[in-house]
UniProtKB/Swiss-Prot annotation:
The lineage of its organism: Bacteria, Pseudomonadati, Pseudomonadota, Alphaproteobacteria, Hyphomicrobiales. It comes from Rhizobium johnstonii (strain DSM 114642 / LMG 32736 / 3841) (Rhizobium leguminosarum bv. viciae). Pfam families: RNase_PH (PF01138), RNase_PH_C (PF03725). The keyword Nucleotidyltransferase applies. Belongs to the RNase PH family. Gene3D superfamilies: GHMP Kinase, N-terminal domain. Its EC number is 2.7.7.56. This is Ribonuclease PH. Phosphate binds at residues 86, 124-126. PANTHER family: EXOSOME COMPLEX COMPONENT (PTHR11953), EXOSOME COMPLEX COMPONENT RRP41 (PTHR11953:SF0). Coiled coil: none annotated. Transmembrane segments: none annotated. The keyword Transport does not apply. It comes from the Bacteria.
Length: 239
């Protein structure tokens, strides 16, 4: 039995609140249960130096957690003067995941930055950031389309979403909360497109190595879960 009482294939309640910020070109407050992340997409009419005069744009991401997003207050990374390794790893993952479904040539020489700020953490912050980040990116592109800058369907090739799965109490489970994640025997994150393409898989055995059969079970849970998330994304943006 999972601590939350959920079934092994049951995700937490997921919701998207679009246009949460009045300033950003695109924004979304995403909730995976008690994990809440504010995702904003900001457009800049510039590209990184290595892309200048190529006609291509760029999509990148930054990630952070508010000091009291967790049970005890954390020091702001800005106060320490540098980002931690975990932060850098997660924001690179978010950027890679979103770029996987963007035609950078069709975007033109512009940069969109996704800022994913964790307001409250209860496991799965990176997967929530990717899934909510897609909504914010979509709304940013719609903002651009309304100003005749691009066509959304030429720039955005597909949906992308992410979910965590793991072995908890010797059972494969989906969408681990913090209590499960902190004591899971295996922890994995899956990023996939709406058409089923695999963008990234991160999997680690915390103690006992996991078998190929267990991995296959996690993969199937993830496929089903991401299918549900993509359906929720479509419902959110199509009204």
């Amino acid at each position: 039995m999972r601590p939350s009482g959920r079934k092994i294939d049951q995700m937490r309640k997921v919701s998207f609140e679009r246009n949460f910020s009045k300033h950003a070109e695109g924004s979304c407050l995403v909730k995976f249960g008690d994990t809440h992340v504010l995702c904003t997409a900001s457009l800049e009419e510039k590209t990184p130096p290595w892309l200048r005069n190529t006609g291509k744009g760029w999509v990148t991401a930054e990630y952070g957690m508010l000091p009291r997003a967790t049970g005890e207050r954390m020091k702001r990374e800005a106060a320490a003067g540098k980002q931690g390794g975990r932060t850098q790893e997660i924001q690179r993952l978010i950027g890679r995941s979103l770029r996987a479904v963007v035609d950078l040539q069709a975007l033109g020489e512009r940069q969109i930055t996704l800022d994913c700020d964790v307001i409250q953490a209860d496991g799965g912050t990176r997967t929530a950031s990717i899934t909510g980040g897609w909504i914010a990116l979509y709304d940013c592109l719609k903002w651009m389309e309304s100003r005749n800058m691009i066509k959304v369907d030429r720039v955005l090739k597909d949906h992308v979403a992410a979910i965590s799965c793991g072995i908890f109490a010797s059972q494969p489970v989906i969408d681990l909360d913090y209590l499960e994640d902190s004591s899971a025997e295996t922890d994995a994150n899956f990023v996939m497109t709406g058409t089923g393409g695999i963008v990234e898989i991160q999997g680690t055995a915390e103690g006992t190595p996991f078998s190929e059969g267990e991995f296959t079970s996690l993969m199937q849970l993830a496929r089903n879960g991401i299918g549900e998330l993509v359906a929720l994304q479509k419902q959110a943006v199509e009204g």
